[in-house]
Amino acid sequence: MTSVGKYLVMIYDDEAKWAAAGPPAEQANHLRHQEFAAANSAALRGGAQLGESSTATSIRRDGNGGFVVTDGTFAETKEVMGGYYLIEAADLDEALEIAKQVPSPMGGVEVRPIVNGG
């Protein structure tokens, strides 16, 4: 294991569940994220909430040297990436312990190491 590394914690949520839950649930979740950020400020190196998947634009190569630009997410799935945190941790185990604290009541998180220190 490396001495200290950076990890991307990607937050995936089901937008339909959030829509059904309404603004009070969203506001409560924002508060939980603020609390998470305050409790883990020593490890956080960045993070942000992303716009809804309906605002996404995907770019794919067309196989002829050009590109195809389409509205929508790259992959069509029920859960979409709604935000992320960049964290610094001693190792993957520590990163996972931090990631377990990320509020994600309508989905979950995925943790990946940043290659070559970012």
Language model region names:
Residues 1-118:
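Conserved, structured core segments of small domains
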